[in-house]
Regions:
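Basic, often amphipathic N-terminal segments
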Residues: 1-87, 108-169
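Short edge beta-strands and adjacent beta->alpha junctions
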Residues: 91-92
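Extracellular/luminal beta-rich ligand-recognition
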Residues: 96
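Short, low-order "capping/linker" segments at domain edges
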Residues: 99-109
Length: 172
């Protein structure tokens, strides 16, 4: 969970919170290197202020009558007892058009169940603050978004996928 009340953004001024899954340190460090590459090579900074994560509930505005503690309590009471924990896996890099470059998390029913349970708990704690996305859920870990220069996505994806091959070779 991240509270972004102190940050202002011209694109999303009313969004104060999102809920995501943090990743193990080794994966986080590798993906921070990917973010650094995108910043150094293309000047990308959008999305780099948040920790590396898989989003479960996208950014939303939490009304003042509710608190982050209300959300945490709801997740603790409604989601944790369901024992929805599992091990996720990353398979390569991909993109949503020319807008978002991401590490592709292998989607399965466990990710969907976790996302649905967390969204339900948030809506129970703070009705109307967000809504379940109607699109199919694609868990992913954004490396860069919104400020990727036009025409560079193919080259950036090639570099990211080569990096993945180097990581696999060094672990094998």
């Amino acid at each position: 969970m991240k509270n972004r009340n102190n940050r202002s953004s011209t694109n999303f001024p009313q969004q104060t919170h999102f809920i995501g899954v943090l990743l193990p340190e080794d994966i986080t460090l590798t993906l921070e290197d990917c973010r650094r590459y995108m910043k150094d090579a293309y000047g990308c900074k959008s999305g780099h202020a948040t920790p590396i994560h898989v989003t479960l509930v996208p950014p939303f505005r939490l009304p003042e009558e509710y608190s982050t503690a209300d959300l945490a309590r709801a997740i603790e009471n409604e989601v944790l007892p369901k024992g929805l924990g599992f091990t996720g896996h990353i398979d390569n890099f991909d993109a949503f058009g020319d807008r978002t470059l991401f590490a592709k998390v292998i989607s399965n029913e466990k990710w969907v169940a976790l996302r649905d349970a967390v969204t339900s708990a948030v809506l129970k704690a703070a009705p109307g603050c967000t809504k379940k996305d109607a699109r199919p859920y694609q868990p992913h870990i954004s490396c860069s978004n919104r400020d990727i220069p036009a025409g560079v996505m193919t080259d950036a994806l090639q570099v990211m996928n080569e990096l993945k091959r180097v990581i696999i070779k060094s672990c094998g």
